[in-house]
Amino acid sequence: MLSLQAMAKMAVATNTYSKYHYPILKVFGLWWKNNTLNGPIKICNHCNNITVGEYPMCYNHGMSMDVALIRAVKDRNISLIQLFTEWGGNIDYGALCANTPSMQRLCESLGAKPPKGRMYMDTLIHLSDTLNDNDLIRGYEIFDDNSVLDYVNLVRLKIMLTLKARIPLMEQLDQIALKQLLQRYWYAMAVQHNLRIAIHYFDNHIPNIKPFSLRCALYFNDPFKIHDACRTVTMDPNEMMNIACQQDLNFQSIYYCYLLGADINQAMLMSLNYGNLSNMWFCIDLGANVFKEARALAGKKNRRVLQYILGLNIFKRELIPPCKDPDPSQIQILLKNYILKNVSTVFTYYCQ
């Protein structure tokens, strides 16, 4: 049950007030100031999110009660920890990111279970498996700069995160810091499952995430996100094509890179090398013609049937009309239900 003081603060936080009330709000404990925040604390009447400062939309700047509590624990702001806990924040999440013994004791005094053993890893896996905007944001906030992860098996953790994210988070296991790896992991999970609120939150809170957002968009075949990321990120079209070819059936990503000037012959060979044959046939439909090199590569990979098929002189090229500009709407309409034309040519040849 809420204390009378917590109820009074909640009543004030859910109402509108002017700048003339700011001195009172500071005294009243409804003010949050740290390195990134400095303003009055408000509660959105529609979604119960916490906002700090004069923001008209909590979607853009708000945080759930749990996230507000987690960030208060990281700030070591005792009064806000107590307040957000009374308002309904889950103090167990606070205990998982308590960065000093005194903060840990405070969380436990407010009802948190003492974190033990696998509780940290179990929580990380659980929050990413629910595929929920708020849970991904909670996971990011709990484990960002969390010193407890210094004591886990880093190689095993990195492999697990990469497998769950379904996208290469790094080139080599020792090439990236754990903090950056986790940031990429939460972002990749949000993009993979199209969790727009989480994506928007991470775009605003994870520094230098834009280059990785382009990689995610290419890997998960989203021309709209590719188009958006290309406004702020500069990447060589052939490097973009390499990323697009790593996941099969990425026709829209491949076509976008092709329109930017990426080498479609190189894309054909990369797709074959990755074992993504649908991508390879799509490149042939676009005009790729390095059949001699492709046959040699198929032979090295012991794909004898494919090696023979690629030697047939039956293929048609440039079967897809090029767009003038890489317009994501046109690309999606053109390729959403695309049928590989040269695959049909092969079937027709053998069925005659």
UniProtKB/Swiss-Prot annotation:
InterPro entries reported for this sequence: ASFV_MGF360
Keywords (A to Z) from UniProt: Early protein
Factors inducing expression: Expressed in the early phase of the viral replicative cycle.
GO biological process, one term: taxis
Family classification: Belongs to the asfivirus MGF 360 family.
Function according to Swiss-Prot or TrEMBL: Plays a role in virus cell tropism, and may be required for efficient virus replication in macrophages.
Protein name (record): Protein MGF 360-16R
